[in-house]
A protein has these predicted regions:
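Juxtamembrane and boundary regions of transmembrane helices in multi-pass small-molecule transporters
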Residues: 2-25, 158-162, 166, 174-248, ...
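Helix-loop-helix module between adjacent transmembrane segments
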Residues: 7, 14, 90-97, 115, ...
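Alpha-helical transmembrane segments
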Residues: 7-19, 57, 118, 122-127, ...
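Membrane-interfacial loop-to-helix junctions in multi-pass transporters
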Residues: 9-10, 31-34, 80-84, 110-126, ...
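Structural signature of hydrophobic alpha-helical transmembrane segments
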Residues: 22-37, 80-92, 139-141, 213-216, ...
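Flexible hinge motifs at transmembrane-helix junctions and intramembrane kinks/re-entrant loops
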Residues: 26-33, 40-58, 75, 223, ...
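Core transmembrane alpha-helical segments of multi-pass membrane transporters/permeases
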Residues: 55, 74-104, 129-134, 300-335, ...
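Hydrophobic transmembrane alpha-helices that form the pore/transport pathway of multi-pass ion
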Residues: 111-178, 184-197, 370-406, 429
Length: 466
């Protein structure tokens, strides 16, 4: 009852603030006010209720039309956007990799080489990173990695298993930054950039910028978990060796999936050479993997593997972000939001580079505390970040990419990710919510600092200079 009352109180306060927000700016036209109001209502529902986040986003997108903040053609075009079909194809590719056993082979094969607990943790971290390119869903990657828990005892008394149950989802989440297809929010960020500036990150560029950061943040998380939750003796404790020879040879299905996946990644990395969009390549891969006699699953099974709820969530969020920009509501919002931290109204141009990077990193990293969805964070903060960059005369692509790296951080509460919930309640014992809070208290500021270091050591020199 107390929690319900607190939730209702939060909704009332938020609604009051929203009403003031919409009524106060007298210089906004009605469509901009409508877009701002719908956006505010969506954020309130995302943060204070248990309503399905995808339903909220989709309903918000539909509500834009009668209020003239978007037109019907934009709504229909949303459902046929190339990002929608890129995600659909990526889900089928991920399902094929997972169902064929290839994902488990990758993680299990590397982890089987471990002789001590510390080696197991480091090798598992290394094995999980490639899954970011293979399976587009964090919960899908978590499900594929769940069997790895069997490498440690499940008697409930071994702290190594508890730490291991924490390590796997944490690495899955921080490694999300490695690939453009690692999360739907990345594709949404690319669409926002395309809408505003006609620019795209591209699969290869994202890997160039995101993979080094993902490797560094994954290594940082592994090192902290080993030191924070295990003693030196526990880290050096031997584990039972699962020899790689115990695993069967590659099946014909695994071979077919490997060939299709390799061809897909090769085409994604060479888009500029052949001209095929990454969404088109994903659809071709989807057709190949579900083709009779060639694929490893039926077309019907492939469609069931697609997370249509997430896809509609991304579609609704895209239209919401587009409406904020087109109606000029985002321009007003960005001045209010970023003025609070000293980078609004173009003032970022006068600040030291390190101060701007730190402000972007702080805002984006902290956003997971009030918006638990990757896509919701990008929909809410993506347009303001782009407009802040434009008003300050700094590079929008760099600002949005760095902000996306910060928005990928979501490790404070289990509710922030299905991957965390899966390992918290893992059969045989998982981690405790307090473990995650302890970890995040140290990892969050270090991850923020890592973003700043990565900018000056790598991003700035590889095409992401402000």
């Amino acid at each position: 009852m107390k929690m319900a009352a607190a939730r209702w109180a939060a909704m009332v306060v938020a609604a009051g603030l929203l009403a003031a927000l919409v009524l106060l700016p007298t210089d906004l036209l009605p469509p901009a006010r409508a877009a701002l109001a719908i956006f505010g209502i969506a954020v309130i529902l995302w943060t204070t209720t248990r309503l399905d986040a995808a339903w909220v986003a989709f309903a918000a997108a539909v509500a834009l039309v009668p209020l003239q903040a978007a037109d019907q053609r934009e709504l229909m075009a949303m459902l046929g956007h190339n990002i929608i079909w890129l995600m659909a194809g990526a889900f089928v590719i991920g399902a094929a990799i997972q169902s064929s056993g290839l994902a488990a082979r990758i993680t299990g094969g590397i982890a089987a080489k471990a002789r001590t607990t510390a080696q197991l943790f480091w090798l598992t971290t290394l094995a999980l990173i490639p899954l970011t390119f293979l399976i587009p869903s964090t919960s899908g990657r978590a499900a594929a990695a769940l069997p790895a828990l069997a490498l440690l005892p499940d008697d409930g008394a071994d702290p190594r298993r508890r730490a291991f149950a924490l390590l796997i989802p944490v690495v899955i989440l921080v490694a999300t930054s490695a690939a453009l297809t690692g999360a739907g929010s990345h594709l949404l960020a690319q669409d926002l950039l395309d809408q505003r500036l006609g620019e795209r990150f591209g699969f290869a560029n994202w890997a160039l910028w995101g993979l080094p950061f993902a490797l560094a943040s994954s290594a940082l998380a592994c090192a902290i978990i080993l030191r924070m939750f295990l003693t030196a003796d526990q880290r050096a404790a031997p584990i039972e060796v699962r020899a790689a020879t115990d695993r069967p040879a590659l099946s014909s299905g695994e071979w077919r999936v490997m060939v299709v996946a390799a061809a897909t990644f090769a085409l994604w990395f060479t888009t500029d050479l052949h001209g095929l969009e990454i969404a088109t390549v994903a659809i071709l891969a989807m057709i190949a993997l579900t083709a009779p006699g060639i694929g490893v699953m039926s077309f019907k099974a492939g469609m069931k593997a697609v997370n249509w709820s997430l896809i509609l969530f991304v579609g609704g969020a895209m239209l919401l972000g587009q409406a904020l920009i087109n109606t000029q509501a985002a321009g007003w919002l960005v001045d209010q939001l970023f003025t609070l931290v000293g980078i609004g109204g173009g003032s970022a141009a006068a600040l030291p580079e390190i101060a701007v990077i730190a402000a972007i990193a702080l805002i984006s990293t902290a956003s997971h505390l009030f918006l638990t969805s990757h896509v919701a964070r990008t929909a809410a903060l993506g347009p303001p970040f782009i407009l802040m960059a434009q008003s300050a005369g700094i590079e929008p692509m760099a600002v949005l990419f760095i902000a996306t790296m910060g928005m990928n951080y979501c490790l404070t509460l289990p509710a922030c990710s299905k991957a965390l919930l899966l390992f918290q309640d893992a059969p045989g014992g998982g981690f405790r919510p307090g473990d995650l809070l302890r970890l995040s208290a140290l990892l969050a500021p270090l991850n923020l600092a890592l973003m700043i270091v990565t900018y000056f050591a790598w991003w700035k020199w590889t095409g992401l200079a402000l």
